[in-house]
Amino acid sequence: MEVTCLLLLALIPFHCRGQGVYAPAQAQIVHAGQACVVKEDNISERVYTIREGDTLMLQCLVTGHPRPQVRWTKTAGSASDKFQETSVFNETLRIERIARTQGGRYYCKAENGVGVPAIKSIRVDVQYLDEPMLTVHQTVSDVRGNFYQEKTVFLRCTVNSNPPARFIWKRGSDTLSHSQDNGVDIYEPLYTQGETKVLKLKNLRPQDYASYTCQVSVRNVCGIPDKAITFRLTNTTAPPALKLSVNETLVVNPGENVTVQCLLTGGDPLPQLQWSHGPGPLPLGALAQGGTLSIPSVQARDSGYYNCTATNNVGNPAKKTVNLLVRSMKNATFQITPDVIKESENIQLGQDLKLSCHVDAVPQEKVTYQWFKNGKPARMSKRLLVTRNDPELPAVTSSLELIDLHFSDYGTYLCMASFPGAPVPDLSVEVNISSETVPPTISVPKGRAVVTVREGSPAELQCEVRGKPRPPVLWSRVDKEAALLPSGLPLEETPDGKLRLERVSRDMSGTYRCQTARYNGFNVRPREAQVQLNVQFPPEVEPSSQDVRQALGRPVLLRCSLLRGSPQRIASAVWRFKGQLLPPPPVVPAAAEAPDHAELRLDAVTRDSSGSYECSVSNDVGSAACLFQVSAKAYSPEFYFDTPNPTRSHKLSKNYSYVLQWTQREPDAVDPVLNYRLSIRQLNQHNAVVKAIPVRRVEKGQLLEYILTDLRVPHSYEVRLTPYTTFGAGDMASRIIHYTEPINSPNLSDNTCHFEDEKICGYTQDLTDNFDWTRQNALTQNPKRSPNTGPPTDISGTPEGYYMFIETSRPRELGDRARLVSPLYNASAKFYCVSFFYHMYGKHIGSLNLLVRSRNKGALDTHAWSLSGNKGNVWQQAHVPISPSGPFQIIFEGVRGPGYLGDIAIDDVTLKKGECPRKQTDPNKVVVMPGSGAPCQSSPQLWGPMAIFLLALQR
């Protein structure tokens, strides 16, 4: 008997279908969540409209085998500031509190390696309405030779919105319209930012002095309410006017306390005052209170422009600016310029010579310079001139010119810069002029032209400068256009000619230029030299990790290739197997000269040679490893997600079956698959049922199938599937299967609606009745529900099971009806049987009616069955024969009785062809848990001649 059952188990539930189920990806975008409007009038332009701040939820529904991978991308929309792109690798795209800048076109790209990827898009339009802004402008013009003045007022209302807003102007509570009278004009100006409407009041009249309201509306799109702003126009309405308590340019000494007052001289309504600083925010410690700005202990960094702005939405804002200058001096420099006319670069007797001195000061024009020679003030003469503001030099530079240089002019010259009468320290710089004063030369020390360091180490680039005086050295990059130094600057000054770099990286490799500065030395053509920096870094190899599959007995070649490194060569390669060192493989002569890869050949894959191989490659700077996992394991199965109607329910129990389908990934890469190990576990439970599924030779693209039976409604299950070959277990694949209620169809001989799914098998609420049927179970029912009426659980007796019922408590009244309408069925037989369970318990039970709605000539409802009154606190079954004459629907009608104790429930509705059974089915049926039944049970339709033959053979 056991042998027969095992043989039946192997033959009956397992099927193999044809090959070629691999299919390219197909995609469709559906929307969910808090969408407010969806415009699909134009098929080529799908628009999903959502309110700003709501949650955007888009789903990319995909088909294809293997299961496609989904990627979401976005390009900017009209409300976005610039191009944006974001990638989300998930079938569901969810954005909480979406902003207007997140509007745009969203693309769903699905690909599975078969054919070309599927790309679908939808445009997301974010709806919003900002607070409106209202400004007032006035003009006064003379009319008829100054006899009187005509005053015109423009009220400008501006708002940002999507979609475009509608404007409504009101005077008090009265709505104004265009050309309502000669004194009112409403128009939209050209070339304006945002949406604007202007209310023009011509030749202002007494009645025009009133409160004006600008109301903006997007016509309640997405539930966005209207917004409004009000302004009261009076005969004193005026734009703001300001004056400052200080001059527009304020020069102070460092350390002083600065106070600036911005005084209002006009404006109605009362203007608002605000201080700002440019560039950057107000200094730390600065206090802006009303129109008073206080800066304690001001420093040089606090210099800048301080703006006082007054606004009252009348006219243009009034603005006053104070240029605060904090006295300071820094960076004293000098220049030695030989005779320019003779284009000389050396100091020579008999030629002209110019010494220049400059400091960076605030204010620059207030700096005074004084020259000294050998400690004494320089005396002006025909050969010694002091000039200021040389056009060839920086602004406010003092120059000492020596005409026809004599030997007596040699000496030490000192330039002193100062602020007269200010507590700012003087700055000075010395210049020594002698026969030893020569222009600079620059060179790279021997052996320092090429600097080679390892990545992450410090580096020092050096250039030597000779000459007197020695100018600073300026460093820059040569080989990379517009490249910055590690300091973030394009040019860096070093006083000793050494550029020090910390923790160099590979992108710092290249040529660096060192050149003499034209200040603090000779003002001549810069001298240059170059230093090459080579940054060595460890090798990068591929593959970093690779899964190598091969059948037992077949050879395998493992290759580790060098991608990049410095130096770009393999100095050594070491192979390890499971951490143990392997002898070096033989070297190919052609690859020994410049090796860029390392190879290891396995003559045959065996159980002993299967495992982890590591190739460690070194270039004398560092090392990198290629990892290979060699085995004869079978690849994981590929679940087929496009099975039509995989769920099948059973009318006599709260169980369902599921059609599980899959293909085997690369079955020819390893040994043939002998069988599959199937493990199925109900979610939130630990015990699993394990079954073995034997198979014949599996080919690529061949669709395999197994029917999972005795699954409990409405639970979900985790399914794990593992292929087995002669090598052993392969890679496991897992998925979650969910119960989905199948839609009733009379074409299926055994199809029961348990109402476990929210779709309730396609049933709908009638729109013409008084109230609705409710779907619930023992876990979701209202704890305050009336006692002594309604079922405690569904027909299965489990708290998770759902049923449909009518709640007859208030505000329901006697005779109120609730109708539940089935999908439309095409009549293909003369007789049908409607079977269902009902629960009618309570002293106020009304009636439960079954109607048939015929659709062959309009909609005609016919009573097929009716039951009234209290039938006890039990589930009972009814079989109702019907004979529709054409397409039809069935309707369950619940009628409310005289009181609130009249809840009626139905469950497990079945529609099948043929006549109804003569005997009623016992409602107390037994529910079989998954795996608890006899191992040789199977679906009834699979019992055929083979089963009869096996039973006969057993006897």
Swiss-Prot record:
Residues 24-123, 132-230, 240-323, 338-432, 440-532, 539-631 form the Ig-like domain. Residues 779-788 have a biased composition (Polar residues). A lipid is attached at S932 (GPI-anchor amidated serine). Residues 779-798 are annotated as: Disordered. The gene is MDGA1. The keyword Thylakoid does not apply. This is MAM domain-containing glycosylphosphatidylinositol anchor protein 1. Disulfide bonds join C60-C108, C157-C214, C262-C308, C357-C415, C463-C514, C560-C615. Residues 1-18 form the signal peptide. Residues 933-955 form a propeptide. Interacts heterophilically through its MAM domain with proteins in axon-rich regions and through its Ig-like domains with proteins in differentiating muscle. Interacts (through the Ig-like domains) with NLGN2.
